[in-house]
Amino acid sequence: EYLLDILDWEANVDPDFAARHFLRPRPVRSVAETRAEGWEESWISYRSPDFSAKELTVLPGATATIRDAAAYGMILLQGHGRMGPWDVDTPALIRFGQLTSDEFFVTEAAAVRGVVVVNPSRTDPIVMLKHFGPGNPDLALT
């Protein structure tokens, strides 16, 4: 019952919800520059000092060193490869009790040093969401 009480019912039925809340992805750098380095990255949540998120795509066959100024959690959405020393892959099916290689936490020290992401696929990109907590120094609120 508590959860039902905290829902904003008016916002959930707002016919103009998208117009009021949609955030167009914002590239972190020039797409031409990052694509030449084998990756693309965009801010997808960037209006709150309390949390933010980016979508990172590492192109097929590319190896990219990705640097951030803050720790983050990562969820893999597509592809397989390596992230630092770890194998990463997107599971097609998860059964109860099975471990997966699609969620990781990156410490601030590792993020600042840079995380090497290797995509061995000839056809599929690696796509991941990176979510940050409060006070991300890379975030420019707009």
What are these regions (language model features)?
Residues 1-71:
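C-terminal amphipathic alpha-helical segment
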Residues 17, 22, 43, 51, ...:
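Phenylalanine-focused residue identity feature
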Residues 50-51, 58-101:
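Glycine- and acidic-residue-biased ligand/ion/polar-headgroup-sensing regions
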Residues 86, 97-138:
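Ligand-binding loop in jelly-roll beta-barrel domains
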Residues 55, 93, 114-116:
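Well-ordered beta-strand positions in beta-sheet-rich domains
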Residues 1-20, 119-142:
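Double-stranded beta-helix
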